């Protein structure tokens, strides 16, 4: 191939025996047998075993060479003896007897012994797959990426993105790039701002999403747009959210309904998940209204692998003798029931721990419970306050059987739903009810258009302000704002929100009215969203879109619990790039050029 290699380190086979070959790569493992030294040479593609004889003048050099140094070797391919064949690597039937060694780059540890100790330990993890603190891994990410598991995650990411692009182009979408330096947008998170040198006191914003631009493309006459879009949001890190930067399969279509968008996404993601995972993929993408999701699952991100369903049992406890719930109901609260199959025989500590966990971790004031023994007899602290009719109604509504239990959460409707949802998740996990070998998708639809913000004491948009309300202008003018639904939808997989989307509002009179309900004047809308307003005055087609998160898709397909494991150069949980030392201070000269001053 060239002076560095005739073959990759995964290529040589028995039919290459007696050939002279040249290989290059990293010294992965070294085994000293006195007169012989065996080296596993690793490149991007695989591993080949090298043999160094002590009669060569470079024997001492290879003997003293540190692991992960880069070398080029020339030698003769030999067949291994039957008892030394390594079936775990593709080149395991051969080895290369080295006749020439060239050291391309030797590992050198830092002169400071403490730093050198850190470097030795992280270097050793490449072969051993030993885990190290996240900050150390990210500081030496160039070494961390040499580990097989980490490298495979990045390869998988590349393959998934390539497949997404292929499938979108196959369906007639155009890959169009939108600006990175732009104006602040209303997605809801904090912006990353970039000062303008040529316009002192003014700032660009890095896009939280290409929302406005992709809508402008539809107004421009393009009917199918997509890109693997970089998005920037100043948010705190979570297991499923990387701080700072993330990527999404951003798409928009014109002259479409909600179902048209669903069909594109279902076809695309089913193919991607089926291709890149050994897990089964459920072809069914059920539609679940937001209201139903909050009632049955206690979350707008339900994990459908969990078979437990929450029930509303408020009416059963109304006017009952259980005064805690009775009093709550009289004050406008609700009661939700969560079944716990085959737990009636569990010790009291099982139930006490769930109650304590709900109080400490979920903010619950407490949980009630009833157990039904093998004969179906109700027991527990609540049972004695309920007559047989009420107990039978609980059994019927929650579908519990003899030997099962039921937990109860009572609070304001939203709080009770959230607590019940978290208890459902906890029970599903602890009772082993979740099938880890399947992907289950669902659509959450019919979100509220508006929400009442208790802090600001005013009505605000629940999600995307640019979505079309059900009923259009008529509903905005005649309905209670909190009863209006939106053509907004989320795609969820195994309890992880993959994306949000909407059918857009393409009519200015509806847009002005919607923003007016949220407290914005026409002048404010014109100022804040001038480009979109101008465009909509010149014929805007019905359009809609969605943007599944690429990082989250890869996280699910790689079966990783943390999204940072599938990002090549991630930030840590504090939003720091410890490899490059960002964020960093800027010198005064640079600040003056930008008309900025740091206030301590």
From Swiss-Prot:
EC number(s) stated in the UniProt entry for this protein: 6.1.1.23
Ranges where the record places region Aspartate: 211-214
Keyword DNA damage recorded: no
One Gene Ontology cellular component annotation held by this UniProt entry: cytoplasm
Pfam families for this protein: GAD (PF02938), tRNA-synt_2 (PF00152), tRNA_anti-codon (PF01336)
Keywords, ordered alphabetically: Aminoacyl-tRNA synthetase, ATP-binding, Cytoplasm, Ligase, Nucleotide-binding, Protein biosynthesis
Subcellular location: Cytoplasm
Entry-linked PROSITE patterns: AA_TRNA_LIGASE_II (PS50862)
SUPFAM superfamilies named among the record's database cross-references: Class II aaRS and biotin synthetases, GAD domain-like, Nucleic acid-binding proteins
Chain positions of site Important for tRNA non-discrimination: 33
GO molecular function: aspartate-tRNA ligase activity; aspartate-tRNA(Asn) ligase activity; ATP binding; nucleic acid binding
Binding site for ATP: 233-235, 497, 549-552
GO terms of biological process kind: aspartyl-tRNA aminoacylation
Top-level taxon in the UniProt lineage: Bacteria
Cytoplasm found in the keyword field: yes
InterPro entries linked: Aa-tRNA-synt_II, aa-tRNA-synth_II, aa-tRNA-synth_II/BPL/LPL, Asp-tRNA-ligase_1, Asp-tRNA-ligase_1_N, Asp/Asn-tRNA-synth_IIb, AspRS_core, GAD-like_sf
Assembly description: Homodimer.
Annotated NCBIfam families: aspS_bact (TIGR00459), PRK00476.1 (NF001750)
Primary role: Aspartyl-tRNA synthetase with relaxed tRNA specificity since it is able to aspartylate not only its cognate tRNA(Asp) but also tRNA(Asn). Reaction proceeds in two steps: L-aspartate is first activated by ATP to form Asp-AMP and then transferred to the acceptor end of tRNA(Asp/Asn).
Record-stated family: Belongs to the class-II aminoacyl-tRNA synthetase family. Type 1 subfamily.
Protein name: Aspartate--tRNA(Asp/Asn) ligase
Protein's organism: Wolbachia pipientis subsp. Culex pipiens (strain wPip)
